[in-house]
Amino acid sequence: MRHFYKLALMLVALAFIVSACGPAATQPPAAPAATQAPAQPAATEAPAATVAPAATAAPAAGGLQIPEIEQGKFNVAAVLIGPHDDGGWSQAHYEGLTYVEKNVPNVHIAYIENVPEGADSEQVFRSLSRKGFNLILGTSFGYMDPMATVAEEFPDITYIHLTGYKSNMKNFGNLMGAMEDMKYLAGMLAGSRAKKDGNPKLGYMATFPIPEELRLGNAFMLGAKKTCPECTMDVRWINTWHDPVAEKDAAASLMDAGAQVVLTGADTPAVADVAQAKGKWGITYDYVGSCKVERCLTTIYWNWGPIYSKIAAGVIAKTYKPGFDYFDADSGSLGLFGFMEGQTMTKGVSDLPAADIQMVKDTLAQMLAGKFTRLDVFAGPIKDNKGKEIVPAGSKFEQADLDQFPPGAPGLTCKYCMYWWADGITAELPKLGN
């Protein structure tokens, strides 16, 4: 659901926040006997610590060193927006990559971290392609258009873009998961915690004003209303995915303004550290191992390994067709810390009312069984924070409604769309335009 690139965002949100072909890529080796994705590990345990594979020195692209392939192997590279050990979004992808190496035969992996969106990323994707990588993963929203451009130049290489909304249905695919499922459940916990503490005020640290951030904030508020009808939520826009200082400042601002529980949409565990210092509660994001302090209520996390392995095995076997892949909780790739198999609830959750905890467990069970999806999170009746009916009773969202701002914006066609704040959110909508 993810990182920000100004040109791409202009196409989605009315200018909101605002090549030379290389030699042909080496062909992947013959498919191994087993083409099915490897068995998924327990989605509830933090992946074991891994050591970053060494990258062989090579000509730089935009000041970044490009790793080498290993001849005779299927070569997979990931381009990361932040450090591979950031304790959040990039680390979750990095550990998913190492899972591929361990579970799909004859695979070599590499990664490049701290790659800015824009021109530098296009150089990186082109350089990796010229090196001969067979599968290239781009893990930030703002890599979308650069990847699309490079994919046209190298038709024999498979490119997968995380988040975004584009695919050429040939060798450039789109992949994302319904984290709104887990944020909805986290909202239930946050509402219950705030109500029990006698302070029904929540906070949301939003990154960039894109549809993804509005839908996640709305999902969180809709969940909170299930356990705390009187709860309200303030919002701070931080305009970054990874900046521990900015994240701490925003968390402190929300907590000082009265928020009892604060959810982050950014990459680091900073919100929990601030909560620990202020005696409030923080909800971290992206990485299973990010909920380390006592005042971390839970974390909503990704488990990319099985999904990446399935894609890699499919590309090797020539059975994978890039397109639009948007997975729900039943994929096993989304988690709510403290509630998955083998996990223990945090101290901040364990003393909540039994009925609230059971509601979370029951809804999660439905999600894991495929009986409750991201579209059910946004089932009517839903009103916005001005009292306007957004979704009538008996209706629910479609995928385009999750991904698009108001009707008429360039890009997807939507009916209800995602340019509204749910009832209980006290912030104003970000303005469209320059």
Can you annotate each of these PLM segments?
Residues 36-434:
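A residue-level marker of the well-folded mature domains of exported/periplasmic proteins
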Residues 1-8:
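Bacterial N-terminal signal peptides that target proteins for export
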Residues 22-25:
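Bacterial signal peptide processing site
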